[in-house]
Amino acid sequence: MTQAPASLVFPELSFMASSNSAVQALSAELHAVPLTLEGLSVLHQMFRFRWPEWRRLSQSRQQEIAREAAAVLSAPEEAGQSAVYSLLGHKGDLMLVHFRDSFDELNAAELQLNRTALQDYLEPMHSYLSVIELGLYDSSVKLFRQLAERGVAPQSEEWNREVEDTMERQRQAMRPRLYPKIPDSHYLCFYPMDRKRGEQKNWYTLPIEERQRQMEEHGMVGRRYAGKVQQIITGSIGFDDWEWGVDLFAPEPLVFKKLIYEMRFDHVSAVYAAFGQFFVGLRCPVQKLGEWLGVS
């Protein structure tokens, strides 16, 4: 006796198989590029101070230069737009961090400092240009899946409209994180980083759902440090040599080591992360700039 195909005896098996195939196909077809929100423009400036030349100045001239620099930096500091840090180690002596609404305003901040006499004693060592960025992996996967299930083609008019609606809702909800003031914490740790794009390990070729899963795991580590450290992530693809910049603000520095060490063990950091130089500094309030310069 010839046995009937399982799909005829159990038609639900055929349905389940086709459903699984559809789910797999849907996953493969999800748009690969996650949505991001951008906020303030950010510039880090690292300088070496020319102490031998500075010491050759008279005390009155030093005081004059210190007062001029403080006058230029005090207003943006009070607004949470600029901050000065005394760097540890040989990578530099001072680091200035600027948060502004645009690159034009960042350039104006640079030029304003360049026009002061203090600039004659600041030797540029490094800089980093970026914008505050919030990655929307969770929202992206949810939205892209819904659109794919409805058969909405990526980049179509309907697709773009729904994406923009989602972006606008998130933009309003995330506004405080997109447009923050520079935290007044005593310590700052800054470093740039990439996601690997090598032949063996390439972050950008992973399915978006897998990237979303790994980033969620990564974020859970950071959330355990809430209240101990404040993190601001900036995007720099197309702006600087690395893909992201990371600023960590805290009242004591050991938390930087503990947080970054723990993150080394999550999958996305262990397999796909590459890091640049680390800069650690102590907040130098503008009213104490003269003290830092040794001006009595």
Language model: regions and residue ranges:
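Short, conserved charged micro-motifs
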Residues: W54-L57, F103-A108, Q200-N202, P253-K258
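Short amphipathic alpha-helical segments
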Residues: Q59-E78, N114, L206-K228, R264-D266
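Short, well-ordered beta-strand segments in beta-rich or mixed alpha/beta enzyme
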Residues: Q45, L88-S102, C189-M193, F239-M263
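Short, glycine- and small/hydrophobic-rich beta-strand elements in well-ordered beta-sheets
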Residues: L73-G92, Q119-L134, H218-E243, L259, ...
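C-terminal structured interaction module
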Residues: D247-S296
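An N-terminus-focused feature that recognizes amino-terminal "leader" regions
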Residues: L8-S86
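Surface-exposed interaction/gating patches
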Residues: A153-I232
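Hydrophobic, ordered structural segments
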Residues: R50, P76, V84-P183, P251, ...
